[in-house]
From Swiss-Prot:
Family: Belongs to the cytochrome P450 family.
Gene behind this protein: cyp105C1
UniProt-recorded name of the protein: Cytochrome P450 105C1
Molecular function terms, GO-annotated: heme binding; iron ion binding; monooxygenase activity; oxidoreductase activity, acting on paired donors, with incorporation or reduction of molecular oxygen
Gene3D superfamilies: Cytochrome P450
Native organism: Streptomyces sp
Amino acid sequence: MTQAAPVTFSTVRENYFGPPAEMQALRHKAPVTRTAFADGRPGWLVTGYSAARAVLSDSRFTARGEREHPAVPRAATLEDERCRRLIAGQFTARRMRQLTGRTERIVREHLDAMEHMGSPADLVEHFALPVPSLVIAELLGVPPPDREHFQHDTLRWGGFGRSTEEVTEAFVSLGGQLQRLVRLKRTEPGDDLLSGLIAADPALTDEELASIAFLLLVAGHGTTAHQIALGAFLLLEHPDQLAALRADPALTESAVEELLRHLSVVHHGPTRAALQDADIEGTPVKAGEVVVVSLGAANRDPARFERPDAVDVTREDTGHLAFGHGMHQCLGRQLARIELRVALTALLERFPHLRLACPAAEIPLRHDMQVYGADRLPVAW
């Protein structure tokens, strides 16, 4: 089903957490519809769950049509089949167990620092942003003496309210750090992802390895940081769900899946390009046309989820698309789940009286960014 006139994207969320109202309406009226990109190019917008799942699992649509980060070298992308295969081989069960323990330590140290600093505190600045960057440092094998520098540049590059000059400077510094890290791993390999990639394929160039490391940082830092902060915000705004989770910690895994479904922090994406003439549930798409999938709208589809707009930490019906679907599903999804589970569990245990330190309406939200989140989240305990 299509609309006669193209629609443009909206990014203003409903009630802090829901997808834009226009997306919800489109899902009901035209789950596959014509749209127009900012540069005027026509394309397609998918808002229905079944249509989204169909596109993401259809080999006629390629992820290589995605617009790459302008600062990322083209030596490697997370959509290259060879690159994805090599990286996937490094996300082993053993490595995830190791990273669980390290994540617990990182989370504990940051909660200690927050508690020492005293109430109130900004949960974004002091917890949600730094924890994922240090977990990625562990994943890549950044030596302990270099982690403070790595953390500093990561937060300058990925933080909020930074000038263009500061972001550029941090990016250049991060690039240099990653290139030096690759050279170190060639001569002094360790039990980390970069060393594993070098052992798995010695033909990988230094440029490819540094590019992979940067892309993992891009993919794994902001999304996880915003999910942690918004997850805490969502629970604090739904005291019945917070009480249920506190009463039964065994609900943590289902709660994490529900937060992922309900929040879907990526505004619009993933993006696919048609390799050939194809169709999406009967809607014809010409070769070369670009398709954008609204994961947030798809994850609220009443045709797939019962009471889709309700937050329910006991929900057993998962199947959400927060990490995408099919051959290009997020490679780091298990690590992201570990971080969310560990971070939220420890946060709620440490601060049993955690609450917002300002009215919810005063929390600055990132409606205009590709990844939705809070610039700040003042909390008290």
